[in-house]
């Protein structure tokens, strides 16, 4: 798990801190099994970009517009389309605030360690995610 595992690393740290986290892997549709009506759904993943270690954030419809146009996910082939379809078939998700937090990576590589650029992005991504969670509490 090289840089493309940054979402898993962040998720596991959030889980360690007591937050509800589900690892979906490459199957966005497994969200249907684990979603229980939470007000907010935050998807965290590595995204391909030119500059590794940049934290990107999209909310609501911007996820579909900007993510497709600007950055493609390192894991989910067609994740944007899959998520849009999921919102159509699962009525429960229509009321949830949807958020996407990504950390850019240059390219997925085999390996066990994160690059320094991506490691340095984790605290910024965590801070952003925690602010999303706290917003409106």
Swiss-Prot record:
Gene Ontology biological-process annotations: protein processing
GO molecular function: endopeptidase activity; enzyme activator activity
Gene3D superfamilies according to UniProt: HybD-like
Pfam families (UniProt xref): HycI (PF01750)
Bilayer-spanning residue ranges: none
NCBIfam families (UniProt xref): hydrog_prot (TIGR00072)
Protein's recorded name: Protein FrxA
Provenance organism: Pyrococcus furiosus (strain ATCC 43587 / DSM 3638 / JCM 8422 / Vc1)
The encoding gene: frxA
